[in-house]
Amino acid sequence: MTKWFNVGKIVNTHGVKGEIRVVSRTDFPEERYKVGNTLYISNEKGGEPFPVKITSHRQHKTFDLLTFEGYGNVNEVEQFKGSLLKVPEDQLGELAEGEYYYHEIIGCNVVTEEGEALGTIKEVLSPGANDVWVIKRPKGQDLLIPYIDDVVLQVNIENKLVTIHVTEGLL
C-alpha cells in the first residue's frame, strides 16, 4: 500500500483559466510545484488519489497558484476545492545530512545529554531563520526547542530519539 504525504491544500480557484489557489505544506514549493511534475489530488470523499501534471506555477501573496494539464477553465477545477495535494513516499527525495522531513521528527522522544526525558516532539514550526520543535511534556506547558547545532546534539530517526543540550534559559 502506498504511503501518501500532503504537500498542499487546494483552497479556491483563481481567475477563469483553471488556476487553483494552494496553501502549501511543503518546505520546497519551487521543487515540488515545478512545471512537468506530477501531484496527486485526494478529495474529501476518500478513495485513491489521482494524478495531475503541473503546467504552470507562480506565487501570489501567501498562496501558490497552479494549473494542471487538461484542466483549462474554472469550471473544471471548481471540483477540487477543499482537496489535498499529495505525493507518494518514493517522490519525497533525499535530504542533505542534518535535514529531516517533519513526519520523521514528529513523534521522536527528546532527552537531555544527561539522559533526562523531556517529552515528545508534537509539532514543527518554521517562524524564521530556523525551525522550532514543539515538545509535549508529560506535565506542564509545551517546550519550544530551536533546531540549531548548539541545542540539538543528535537525531536518531530509527530509534525516534533526539538528544539536546540544555542551554541557560531553555527550560
Curated annotation (Swiss-Prot):
Q: What Gene3D superfamilies has UniProt attached to this entry?
A: PRC-barrel domain, RimM
One GO BP annotation is: ribosomal small subunit biogenesis
Which superkingdom is the protein from?
Bacteria
Where in the cell does this protein reside? Cytoplasm
Keyword Chaperone in the entry? The reply is: yes
Record-annotated PRC barrel domain positions: 97-170
InterPro entries to which the protein is assigned, alphabetical: PRC-brl_dom, PRC_barrel-like_sf, RimM, RimM_N, RimM_N_sf, Transl_B-barrel_sf
**Which PANTHER family does the UniProt entry name for this protein?**
RIBOSOME MATURATION FACTOR RIMM
Summarize subunit and interaction data from the UniProt record for this chain: Binds ribosomal protein uS19.
Q: What is this protein called?
A: Ribosome maturation factor RimM
Q: Which organism is it from?
A: Bacillus anthracis
Q: Which gene encodes it?
A: rimM
